[in-house]
Amino acid sequence: MSEVEKKEEETTTTTTVEKTEEKKEETSSFAPAAEIKEYAADVEPNVEYEATLKRDVVEVKTNEENEDTLFEIRAKLYRFDTDPSPQWKERGTGNVRFLEDKDSKRIRVVMRRDKTLKVCLNHHISPALSLGEMTGSDKSWVWKCPKDFSDEEKPEGVEELFAIRFATPENAGLFKTEFQKCQAKNEAIEKKTE
């Protein structure tokens, strides 16, 4: 390589280094800390928001307003489905409650699904109902209901076979005790009305 070529190469590298340093200086957007503190002290944030759409308050009715909760416990509900092949199908998970009407004093059992709050169990606790043990589990009970009103498509009620499962055998025992107490109360009310 000749001396001329070496000098040209050196000048090109120096000019490129100088240009990149200039670009770095131009693109640097950091301000000194003192300037930032001054600016921050002068600025007051405006965080007031107003709703763009005004809505009316809607009263939600659950048809449980005229009832007192006597008992409530978490459980998983199943119903026996015979079509197309006989099997237990999950109806929902949530809190099962015994509700007493303030006027008539009749007690019904109601269960709503957790997230949707859709009713998955709704019938009166009749003295004719028989709560039986589910085979192979000490945490579950089975009973046949002549008319369950939880299905919106069949408001006249439908006959169902239910199974309910609890987290512990103690909870299952509590449920059975309360169920039988409610049956006795409803039986006494039915005898008074006859």
From Swiss-Prot:
Record-annotated RanBD1 domain positions: 42-188
Annotated GO biological process: nucleocytoplasmic transport
CDD domains: RanBD_RanBP1
Signal peptide residue numbers: none
Gene3D superfamilies: Pleckstrin-homology domain (PH domain)/Phosphotyrosine-binding domain (PTB)
Gene Ontology molecular function, alphabetical: small GTPase binding
One Gene Ontology cellular component annotation held by this UniProt entry: cytoplasm
Pfam families per the UniProt record, alphabetical: Ran_BP1 (PF00638)
Biased composition (Basic and acidic residues): 1-10, 18-27
Annotated segments matching region Disordered: 1-36
InterPro entries for this protein: PH-like_dom_sf (IPR011993), Ran_bind_dom (IPR000156), RanBP1-like (IPR045255), RanBP1_RanBD (IPR045256), WH1/EVH1_dom (IPR000697)
UniProt protein name: Ran-specific GTPase-activating protein homolog
Similarity annotation: Belongs to the RANBP1 family.
Organism, scientific name: Dictyostelium discoideum
